């Protein structure tokens, strides 16, 4: 799932290109990121839920209390986005991402 970057009342700064891999588990998401790296495409995960951070755990926050945050986190993949990407780079990223997601999810 790719969220739109523009709408009637908003426009993205295009700082990050975040996708969600519907139906992917935490482990499958990790496998997708690893396979993309093997193809030369560096992906990442942004916005780790606060209850997963040690400081918040030490204050008593528990991930179980925030199921929606975890659900978004577990299958989120951030694709490369920067001003030096050529059209060919974008095509390469998209093609490989689609192939890898299909390979991992079957």
Region roles according to the model:
Residues 1-106:
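PLP-dependent aminotransferase class I/II
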